[in-house]
Amino acid sequence: MADPLDHCPDPAQMDPAQADARIRALREQLVHWAHQYHVLDAPSVPDAEYDRAFQALQALEAAHPALITPDSPTRRVQGAVLQGLTPVRHALPMLSIQTETDTGAGGAQAFDARVRRELGLTDADPAIEYVVEPKFDGLAMGLRYENRRLVQAATRGDGEIGEDVTHNIRTIRQIPLGLPDDAPALLEVRGEVYMRRADFDALNQRQRAQSGKTFVNPRNAAAGAVRQLDANITAQRPLRFFAYGLGAVTAPGEGGPAWRTHYALLQTLKSWGFPVAEQVGIAHGASQLAALHEQIGARRDALPYDIDGVVYKVNALQLQRDLGFKTREPRWAVAHKYPAQEMPTRVEGIELQVGRTGKLTPVARLAPVFVGGVTVTNATLHNLFEIRKKQVRVGDTVTVRRAGDVIPEVVGVLPGQRSAYVANFRMPAHCPVCGSAVVREKGEANHRCTGGLFCAAQRKEALLHFAARRALDIEGLGDKLVDQLVDAELVRGLPDLYRLDLVALSALDRMAEKSAQNLLDALEKSRQTTLPRFLFGLGLRHVGEATAKDLARHFGTLDAIMNASVEQLLQVSDIGPVVAQSLHCFFQQPHNREVVAQLRACGLRWPEGAPPERPAQRLAGKSVVLTGTLPTLGRDAARDLLEAAGAKVTGSVSKKTSYLIAGAEAGSKLAKARELGIPVLDEAGMLALLAGE
């Protein structure tokens, strides 16, 4: 490549055509050098040479500002500090993947058996081909390119709505700002933002030298850097990126790529300048999956970054389409984790934590021990039965691990280490916080405080849950402020939050008038919410974000949910008898209804609509399978229509299948249905069937 700096005249003396040609050449050279340095780890020029070209480009763009484009290397850090992160709805949901609980070879065998069963394969059919990738311990990210330029980067968030962090992601030099001409007009690349261990250690050293905040582990450091409001701070953090998949992309029929395998897709992303992990491999069948899991695990500590397992993906994209998705996870992928790292330490005490629902959780206070990249001082003991099973006592030397490499827990007591007799731990008869009676319901392992919102601990946890980002998202309402509000008896229940005023808040410790006003503004903003967020924020037992969305989608209004019978609740997707009974009991309690009424009276509101009309149960008792791509309906929409008509939608074809609904690129399921003589319908035929035609 010719040196674009040769015979470089004064930028101000160049006409627009000359400047444009020189700018294009410099950008091409800088992008090439940056790819060699940041992606390939193979720099080809000294830093001084890169800096000289970069400064020349800056001078040219300053002299000819009309020629500046968003994908220029000089545009990686730009703009003022943001006031907040903007929510972004993903064009396609960023779903999580299922985790195999068996960390040995059985995990690979279970996944392979499940995939074969879903596809209707027998032992006589050939082994399935899989791609095996490292499971990075970082932050999931979606990069959206339009007309081959990076226009948006968003975090996963709750899978449907993330946060726009484009200003920060542009600072990561491994991520291309522009793509080659053979890339499609629309491309959303999904991957992981992470930090190498050596870079993390160096960052903490710099922070300590500057008396700054140090970080617990590389993942937390990366996540915090990505969510900065000031991109200049993010630019100083050594963030990196690995690509591992796609979201929205131009369809093959509209000029987009037509990949046949996931592995081919990864190689294309690599050719477009995206970093792809070197440890990606191909496996055929369960035995090869288990072998790669073991091989990568053996090299785990030698890798420059943290992984907590591997991810298996069915390689053939047509088979991925055939397998489809469960409610929140793809059927064609799974995470197979490694056994957690373990270390010995001493139990210095056992204390009780009272949770939002009154659950009393014993927590072991430990002599500090470094496990899996963090210093651990506390570990959960779960419940009294777990303590008795493991025979944990104060003073014991125990083995501690980070379960899933995240949550510390006590594995067991090291034999022969108990120095003297210590009494067994006993669960108290009364709550250590409020003095209310402690009970254990029949069939449950957990003890609970009966104090309800009378218990300050439960009240505090309920307020924090209500204010959480994925609930009412009340910015500034953290644990220290909640402690003050409850201890000062300014807030006894959720509605009291909306009765706070500037005078009362300003009188609190470390609460200046500006901070108080900011909280009042956040409370005002939270009054406009959504029904799923409100339901989740109430902290109902067994009701997480996904169940809250299912309830809102099914019933449409809060009143319909509150007045639903157990039988009506059981009709909601993924709700079983325990959850239905718990929900019904909650809304039958006058106190809970009064809390909801007061919150509404305080101005909380959300869009509501009547639940969707359900077609007659024309397909009651029928088993239906979906395969391929339908012309107008998405897979979930088609499933909803069929289930609303009483059908059971399954993932595999068998003799019990009543109908196969087949779209474009239908694969093995279509062949199996024809072999068994099962009626095959297209989308129009399905709609006609639902209409009773």
UniProtKB/Swiss-Prot annotation:
UniProt cofactor(s): Mg(2+); Mn(2+)
Family: Belongs to the NAD-dependent DNA ligase family. LigA subfamily.
Reaction(s) the record says it catalyses: NAD(+) + (deoxyribonucleotide)n-3'-hydroxyl + 5'-phospho-(deoxyribonucleotide)m = (deoxyribonucleotide)n+m + AMP + beta-nicotinamide D-nucleotide
Ranges of residues in domain BRCT: 614-693
Ligand binding (NAD(+)): 47-51, 96-97, 133, 156, 192, 313, 337
Pfam entry (one): DNA_ligase_aden
Binding-site residues, Zn(2+): 431, 434, 449, 455
Molecular function terms from GO: DNA binding; DNA ligase (NAD+) activity; metal ion binding
Function: DNA ligase that catalyzes the formation of phosphodiester linkages between 5'-phosphoryl and 3'-hydroxyl groups in double-stranded DNA using NAD as a coenzyme and as the energy source for the reaction. It is essential for DNA replication and repair of damaged DNA.
Protein name, entry field: DNA ligase
Active site: 135
Gene3D superfamilies recorded: 5' to 3' exonuclease, C-terminal subdomain, 6.20.10.30, BRCT domain, DNA ligase/mRNA capping enzyme, Helix hairpin bin, Nucleic acid-binding proteins
Annotated PROSITE patterns: BRCT (PS50172), DNA_LIGASE_N1 (PS01055), DNA_LIGASE_N2 (PS01056)
SUPFAM superfamilies: BRCT domain, DNA ligase/mRNA capping enzyme, catalytic domain, Nucleic acid-binding proteins, RuvA domain 2-like
Keywords, alphabetical: DNA damage, DNA repair, DNA replication, Ligase, Magnesium, Manganese, Metal-binding, NAD, Zinc
PANTHER family, per database record: CHROMOSOME TRANSMISSION FIDELITY FACTOR 18, DNA LIGASE
Biological source species: Verminephrobacter eiseniae (strain EF01-2)
The keyword Cell wall biogenesis/degradation is annotated on this UniProt entry: no
One record GO biological process: DNA repair
Top-level taxon of origin: Bacteria
GO cellular component: cytosol
InterPro entries referenced in this protein's UniProt entry, alphabetically: BRCT_dom, BRCT_dom_sf, DisA/LigA_HHH, DNA_ligase, DNA_ligase_AS, DNA_ligase_CS, DNAligase_adenylation, DNAligase_N
Enzyme Commission number(s): 6.5.1.2
